């Protein structure tokens, strides 16, 4: 359960309780020919750790998108996720925290995965591949009412694009 409050300046306060996600680690991921792509996003801590290990062992490519779950992990945990993942995506705030905790720059992280995407809100995003940064301009909104859910929309678009074989910059 999540409650997200946004003021007129787009400052957010989030309250989150994992509820049933605390049992998500019970679900096991096995190698299957019909699973082509996965995502590790905010979940119970144990589930995030175990599912990343299981996806790596099953050779299933996955996106590591820690979101609001990032503060649960120390630098060693986060470095392990990076090394297991195929791609990493974070927003600018999370990207700074990820770099601070791991001691890895965005360029460093991008050399350990196929790509790192750092979203910048209304400013678009940075796509890092092999240490090189490409700035992708934003799609201008006709009007912004509430940014709640933008991260979920981003995840869906990213997964769709990866499944289609599109480049990260597309």
Question: What name fits each language-model region?
Answer:
Residues 1-37:
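Conserved N-terminal subdomain of the carbohydrate kinase-like
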Residues 32-33, 82, 110:
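A short, aliphatic-rich alpha-helical micro-motif
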Residues 1-2, 11-14, 36-37, 61-62, ...:
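Structural motif
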Residues 17-21, 66-70, 93-94, 139-142:
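Short, acidic/turn-prone active-site loops that include or flank metal/cofactor-
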Residues 101-170:
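Conserved phosphate-binding/catalytic region of the ribokinase-like
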Residues 1, 47-48, 155:
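Short glycine/serine/threonine-rich phosphate/pyrophosphate-binding segments
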């Amino acid at each position: 359960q999540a409650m997200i409050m946004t003021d007129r300046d787009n400052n957010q306060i989030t309250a989150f309780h994992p509820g049933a996600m605390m049992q998500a680690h019970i679900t096991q991921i096995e190698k299957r020919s019909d699973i082509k792509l996965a995502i590790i996003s905010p979940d119970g801590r144990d589930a995030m750790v175990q599912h990343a290990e299981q996806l790596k062992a099953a050779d299933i490519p996955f996106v590591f998108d820690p979101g609001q779950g990032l503060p649960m992990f120390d630098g060693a945990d986060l470095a392990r996720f990076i090394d297991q993942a195929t791609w990493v995506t974070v927003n600018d705030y999370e990207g700074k925290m990820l770099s601070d905790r791991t001691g890895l720059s965005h360029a460093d992280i991008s050399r350990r995965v196929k790509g790192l995407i750092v979203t910048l809100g209304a400013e678009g995003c940075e796509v890092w591949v092999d240490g090189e940064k490409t700035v992708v301009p934003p799609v201008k909104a006709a009007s912004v009412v509430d940014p709640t859910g933008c991260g979920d929309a981003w995840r869906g678009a990213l997964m769709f694009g990866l499944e289609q074989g599109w480049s990260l910059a597309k």
